[in-house]
Regions:
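Internal active-site segments that recognize and position negatively charged phosphoryl groups
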Residues: 139-143
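Surface-exposed beta-strand/loop patches in extracellular or lumenal glycoproteins
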Residues: 154-160
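Short, acidic/polar linear motifs in exposed loop/turn regions
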Residues: 146-148
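Surface-exposed acidic/polar loop and edge beta-strand patches at domain peripheries
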Residues: 1-137, 150, 161, 165-265
Length: 265
């Protein structure tokens, strides 16, 4: 697969760059909206969390399924797989990952950040990430194909660029959240629950509205003032008590589709 894919809106006011399926740039009217890899904060610019969200350390890295117990590290094994390109046009691209049930995958967090060397999952799945850059927005669609009844959690983890002055706010419904408030959330992130829409409001530059289908919740996370992760999630995992209880999991319908639309304004 070509490491870099560059898409352009039909009116040429926006472009998107993807590196091995990772969203590394979204330029709108020459303004960069995505956190740049190598800058302080986070070493990535986006990733997907599947089939779990959050840490499994509290459960000794074990996740219980109807087919038994399997090792999973933080945010699941999907990130350990490589994307291939299914098709591409000027303003669209479809990436795909496939996993064969029970395949042991090397955990990239081992040994520096995790004692678990291999992770696995007892279900086949195909995971598609479709990118469509329109004149007004960036649409990202996730399609998960697997057997009916598979438990799963899904989260999308993009990082957006901030100006470093901590004067941006996040709004959702009647809630207004500052960057310092989000930072106090630490590694468990700041939950914004039971909503499908959220906005990043800036003093300078383009604001962002994020609308979703299928997720219904968000987490906000940043270790720095120059970036912010606004993460659509199916469930907030840091609920106290037993981690990753079965109530946090969706149950597959065979094919499940989730959407994220990012609109600069």
């Amino acid at each position: 697969m070509n490491n870099l894919v560059v898409l352009h809106s039909l009116d040429n006011t926006a472009s998107v760059t993807l590196e091995k399926g990772e969203l590394v740039s979204y330029l709108k009217n020459n303004e960069e909206l995505i956190h740049q890899k190598g800058n302080p904060g986070w070493r990535n610019s986006d990733t997907e969390m599947f089939p779990i969200i959050g840490p499994s350390k509290e459960n000794k890295f074990i996740v219980t399924t109807p087919k038994g117990n399997y090792n999973q590290d933080q945010h699941g094994l999907l990130r350990e797989l490589d994307y291939s390109i299914e098709n591409q046009t000027k303003n669209t691209c479809v990436f795909k990952k496939k996993y064969a049930a029970y395949t042991a995958i090397e955990n990239s967090k081992f040994p520096e950040k995790s004692p678990i060397k291999l992770v696995s999952w007892p279900y086949n799945f195909t995971f598609k990430k479709s990118i469509a850059l329109t004149n007004s927005s960036l649409k990202i669609t996730f399609e998960i194909s697997t057997e009916k009844g598979m438990p799963f959690m899904l989260g999308y983890h993009p990082a957006f660029m901030l100006n470093g002055n901590s004067n941006e706010v996040v709004t959702s419904n009647s809630q207004e959240i500052s960057i310092p408030e989000i930072q106090k959330g630490g590694d468990t992130a700041f939950p914004v629950l039971n909503t499908s829409e959220i906005s990043l409001v800036k003093k300078n530059g383009l604001n962002l509205k994020i609308q979703t289908k299928g997720f219904h919740n968000f987490m906000l996370w940043t270790p720095a003032t120059n970036m912010l992760c606004i993460e659509p999630i199916t469930a907030y995992p840091y609920t106290g008590g037993k981690m990753l209880s079965k109530e946090l999991f969706n149950i597959s319908n065979g094919v499940d589709v989730f959407e994220v639309e990012i609109t600069p304004y």
